[in-house]
Amino acid sequence: MSDLPNNGILVGVDGSSCAKLAVEWAAREAAGRNVPLRIVHVAYPAVGAWAGWGVSPAPLPENFVPTQEDQARKVIDDAIEIVDAAIEGNDRLPVSSEILWSSAVPTLVDLTKQAQMIVVGYHGRGALARGLLGSVSTALVHHAHCPVAVIHDAAQPSAPTGAPVLVGIDGSPASELAIAIAFDEASWRGGDLLALHAWTDADWPDFPEVEWSATKATAEETLAERLAGWRERYPDVTVRKVVVYGYPARHLLEESKSAQLVVVGSHGRGGFAGMLLGSVSSAVVHGAGVPVIVARQR
């Protein structure tokens, strides 16, 4: 991003269908931003089977390690093929790949310290339920040191022409970073920016209409102030604004149906630096059918 260290896009792969979509999305993202792409497959190192208390590990089956290495190389080779197809004709994009023998979560979290963004599939090969966020993806959206793009298996890496980038804004520091990312995304994608601001995170179904009318004007003014400087920096981006009084997750999910990408902060007005994923962001990551970028701060 324009205001973040330019260390490229990192994508974690494991051979799953979601990871393959993540690779394609990451390749287009890196090409659009003209930044390096780093493909990483983290495989748990081979160890002998544990037979019980006080018993030495059982030996590994013959050819287990070579087979595991072959499988790891295939994951990387398949990912590189996807990248080549996604950026066909662009031979200027620096692409690197590597296999790391370690535990996936701490390794990827540590790698995010040097990344501009990490891209992961919504769930990996180990997902027991297709509708659940995978353990690696969950850890990254909670603990990564850079923004995290989560790609659903229903998402299309090539977004529909004219679809906007949707960003949720609440005035928190995390949403300020989300605004920066969203403007940058909309600019290089050539799309509009749809900025949605909820006056409150609360769900107030009986809020008096006359009072909301007055409050809405104040909320619209606040949103305009939040966007003013960014609109000057990105004059090529057309901005549309939506102000609602509450139910931010519900409204973001509804608007995401016609968006190509959603950007949300890692936590909202009630959060604090370093806290876990906020309720609104969590609902969007789980419920959106398009790629979602969680604007995690360093």
What are these regions (language model features)?
Residues M1-P5, C18, Y44-V47, N63-P66, ...:
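Structural beta-alpha unit
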Residues S2-L60, A163-S213, R231-R233, T238-V242, ...:
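Small/aliphatic-rich secondary-structure junction motif
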Residues P5, V23, R28-G32, V105-S158, ...:
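Gly/Ser-rich helix-loop-strand patches that form or flank binding pockets
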Residues P59-K74, W212-A219:
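A short acidic, glycine-rich active-site loop
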Residues A72-I80, L223, L227:
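N-terminal membrane-insertion helices
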Residues E81, T138, A228, R250, ...:
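Active-site phosphate/pyrophosphate- and oxyanion-stabilizing loops and adjacent acidic/basic residues
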Residues P94-S96, P147, D192, T238-R240, ...:
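Conserved beta-strand segments of alpha/beta enzyme cores
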